[in-house]
A protein has these predicted regions:
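Short acidic active-site motifs
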Residues: 31-35, 58-59, 110
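Sec-dependent signal peptide recognition
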Residues: 2-9
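Primarily the HKD phosphodiesterase
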Residues: 38-99
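Solvent-exposed loop/turn segments at secondary-structure junctions
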Residues: 53-57, 79-83, 107-110, 121-122, ...
C-alpha cells in the first residue's frame, strides 16, 4: 500500500498542461522492475544504457526486442563487475543480436545505472540490471519523462563513459 501511495504521489509531479513527469518505483516490491521495463519498451529511436552489474534476462530481452524494432541500442558497462558467467552470457546475447556493448575499467567501479530513452527520458536510481535487484535487494528507480534538458546532461555523461570503453567481443 505504501508503495502505491508513493508511486501515486510521484506521478503528481506533473507539469500542468505538459507531458513532463517523474515516476518512482521500488524493489523487491516489484514496481522498480516494471518501471524499468516500461521505460525501455517505450523507446522509439534510441536507448543508451549504462550499468554496473548486468545479468537480467528481462532487460536483455527488452533491449534485443527494441533493436529488432529499429531502435538504436548502445550499452556501456563496468568491466570488472561483468566477468561472471551470467553477465558474460547476457552481454554475449546483446552483441550477437547486433547491439554495441562496451566495457569500462577506467574507474575503480563504474557504478552508474542509467538508461536514456529517445534523448528525452532518463531512468536512473540504485537498481542494477540484475535478478538480485529485482527480487532480493532494496532498490529504487526514478524515471524523468520528457525532460530533454536533463536527458542531455545524462547523455553527455554516458558519452564520456562510452568513449572510454572497449568494444565487447562475443565469446561464443
Amino acid at each position: 500500500m505504501k508503495i502505491r501511495i508513493m508511486v501515486f504521489l510521484a506521478s503528481l509531479l506533473c507539469t500542468i498542461g505538459g507531458h513532463t513527469h517523474v515516476i518512482v518505483g521500488f524493489s523487491p516490491e516489484g514496481s522498480a522492475q516494471k518501471l524499468v521495463m516500461n521505460t525501455l519498451n517505450s523507446a522509439h529511436h534510441a536507448i543508451n544504457l549504462m550499468g554496473y552489474s548486468f545479468t537480467s534476462p528481462e532487460v536483455v530481452k527488452a533491449l534485443i526486442t527494441a533493436k529488432r524494432r529499429g531502435v538504436d541500442v548502445r550499452v556501456v558497462l563496468d568491466s570488472k563487475a561483468n566477468q561472471g558467467r551470467a553477465s558474460v552470457a547476457a552481454i554475449n546475447l546483446l552483441v550477437n543480436a547486433g547491439i554495441e556493448v562496451r566495457t569500462v575499467d577506467k574507474n575503480k567501479i563504474m557504478h552508474d545505472k542509467v538508461a536514456i530513452i529517445d534523448d528525452v527520458t532518463v531512468q536512473t536510481g540504485s537498481f542494477n540490471y540484475t535478478r538480485a535487484a529485482q527480487r532480493s535487494n532494496s532498490e529504487n528507480v526514478v524515471v524523468m519523462w520528457q525532460m530533454p534538458e536533463v536527458a542531455q546532461v545524462y547523455l553527455e555523461h554516458w558519452q564520456s563513459r562510452w568513449s572510454q570503453g572497449q568494444a565487447w567481443q562475443s565469446r561464443y
